[in-house]
Amino acid sequence: MTGVSVNQFPAAGTVENSPYERLAALGIELPPPPPPIANFVTHVLEGNMLYLSGQGPREADGFLHAGKVGAGGVGVEQAYGHARLTGINLLSVMHEALGDLSRVKRVVKLLGMVNAVPDFEDHPSVINGCSDLLIEVFGPAGEHARSAVGFGSLPGNITVEIEAIVALHG
C-alpha cells in the first residue's frame, strides 16, 4: 500500500508509454463502464475538462463490494483494493467519454469517500488505491489534488465512492 513514484515510469517514446500499454503491463482490462444508479450521467465533457460522477467498487460481473471500513469491518488493505477497482471503473468511464485515454492531459482532482465506522481515521490510505493506479496509468499526469473523507453511509452500502475531474489536451 505504498505510494507510487512517478520516477518508476519509462521515458517518453519507450515501450509501456501510453495509458493502454501501461494498463496491459499491469494486467488490467477495462470493463464496460458501470451504468448510473439514479437520475444522472456518468460524465460531463465541457470544453477541455471531463467531470466524472462518483463510481464504486463494481466488479465486471456487477458485484458491488459493500461494508463499513474500520474495526470489525472491512480492513484498510481490502478497502485499498476496492478503491483501486473503483479507479479502474473511472478509467472505463474516461475511455467511454473520450474514446482514447491518451487525450488525458492531467488528472486534476479526486474526491474519495469512504464508508467508515465512526472512529476510523485512515481514509487517505484507502483512497491511495485509486490514486496509485492513476499514477501507474498516466505517470506524472496522474498526480492530482485530492480529498479523502469518511461518511456514515454510501449508496448500496459500498465501501468507497470516488469522483474525478480531468483536464484534456486541447
What residues fall within each predicted segment?
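Short, polar/acidic, helix-capping and beta-turn segments at strand->helix junctions
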Residues: 2-170
